[in-house]
Each structure stands twice: as structure tokens, then as C-alpha cells.
């Protein structure tokens, strides 16, 4: 660090748009956390650049992590987003089935503690002019880092737009989640 030279480089599987969070784990070690454009979440050793773990935040083909994961008390809170809206602009694409969400992960192991979606499971809503299925509700991705209030055990997150009609009331909204269970408070 004194020389200004890079000590290590980590090659993630996809582009990175999040900032990096740093946290002290329950075993006393330090870890760096970030997400990538393939929807993966990473824990990296800051001294060696070695991967501690990597998980897929969501299994949807268009899932992305664009908001910075937030570390608190050996938990990582990860906002879930997507680029399905871009695919949905194609008239032959069945738009859209991605649902935004928030993921709680054990920062030491990468194991999922809970995952909460911002909208209900999409259902068939009719067809477009080409006869291609349209689904809703969808979207309401969480694009940015959530805000934690440890005193009230609440996580606040802002959601993006719905990808098709009818729009979900949870889209373009501020939502509150229980830090311990992931339950939606409002």
C-alpha cells in the first residue's frame, strides 16, 4: 500500500456496478462484499483477494445486483434487481416474470437466511398484439443499497417500476422490511 501498487486483483464473473461493503465477521476476520451483473454476491478476503464465497442472489435469467449489499452484525442485506425490462421491450418476449427483492445472507458462510420479494408471484395477464403472453405483477426491483435501522429492526428500500401492466402498488415505492424475518412491514 505504501508504494501505490496493486496488491491483488479479483476477476468477478461479470461486470460490477455496486460499491464495496466491508465487514468484520463473527470469527474476527474482515471481508469485502459486492454484487455483479450476473446476479452473484461475493465475499472476498481483503488481504489476499481470495474468494471466501460467492452465491447466486436470484435464479432469474435477468437478475442483477446493482445496489450495494449492506453489512450489519454478521448479516449481509442484498438488493435484487434485473435487466428484464430491456428484454421486455422485444415484442416476442414474454414480459415479465422478474420480481425485485431483498436477500439476507449469513456473511460468514454465504447461506441464505431469508429472501423476500417485493411483489407477488406473476400470473398471466393476457397477450400482446403478437399473441405473446404478458405477466404481472413484476419489476419493483431494488436498484440501490437499502437503509438499516437496527433500533427498530427495520430495513428501508426504494423500488423501481413495474415492467408491464397492471403496475404493482409496490413499484416506485418505499418499502419497510423486518431485519430478522424479511417480512414486509409496509
What is each model feature region?
Residues 1-2, 25, 46, 107, ...:
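Inter-blade boundary loops/turns of WD-repeat beta-propellers
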Residues 1-7, 35, 43-44:
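Glycine-rich active-site/cofactor-binding loop and its immediate structural neighborhood
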Residues 3-12, 50-59, 111-135, 183-186:
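Aromatic (tryptophan-biased) beta-strands that constitute blades/sheets of beta-rich domains
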Residues 13-41, 64-94, 99-102, 133-167, ...:
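Repeat-blade elements of multi-bladed beta-propeller folds
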Residues 39-40, 45, 49-51:
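Accessory beta-strand-rich segments of carbohydrate-active enzymes
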Residues 44-45, 97-111, 170-183:
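Beta-propeller blade signature
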Residues 48, 80, 84, 106-109, ...:
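A generic secondary-structure signal for well-formed alpha-helical elements
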Amino acid at each position: 500500500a505504501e508504494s501505490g501498487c496493486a496488491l491483488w486483483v479479483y476477476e468477478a464473473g461479470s461486470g460490477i456496478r455496486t460499491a464495496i461493503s466491508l465487514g468484520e465477521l463473527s470469527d474476527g476476520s474482515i471481508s469485502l462484499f459486492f454484487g455483479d451483473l450476473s446476479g452473484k454476491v461475493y465475499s472476498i478476503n481483503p488481504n489476499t483477494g481470495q474468494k471466501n464465497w460467492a452465491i447466486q442472489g436470484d435464479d432469474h435469467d435477468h437478475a442483477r445486483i446493482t445496489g450495494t449489499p449492506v453489512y450489519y452484525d454478521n448479516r449481509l442485506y442484498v438488493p435484487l434487481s434485473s435487466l428484464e425490462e430491456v428484454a421486455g421491450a422485444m415484442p416476442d418476449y414474454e414480459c415479465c416474470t422478474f420480481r425485485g427483492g431483498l436477500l439476507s445472507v449469513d456473511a460468514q458462510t454465504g447461506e441464505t437466511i431469508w429472501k423476500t420479494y417485493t411483489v407477488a408471484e406473476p400470473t398471466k395477464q393476457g397477450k400482446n398484439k403478437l399473441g405473446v403472453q404478458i405477466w404481472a405483477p413484476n419489476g419493483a426491483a431494488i436498484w440501490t443499497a437499502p437503509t438499516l435501522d437496527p433500533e427498530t429492526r427495520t430495513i428501508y428500500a426504494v423500488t423501481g417500476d413495474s415492467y408491464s401492466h397492471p403496475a404493482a402498488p409496490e413499484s416506485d415505492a418505499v418499502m419497510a422490511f423486518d431485519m430478522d424475518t424479511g417480512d414486509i412491514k409496509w
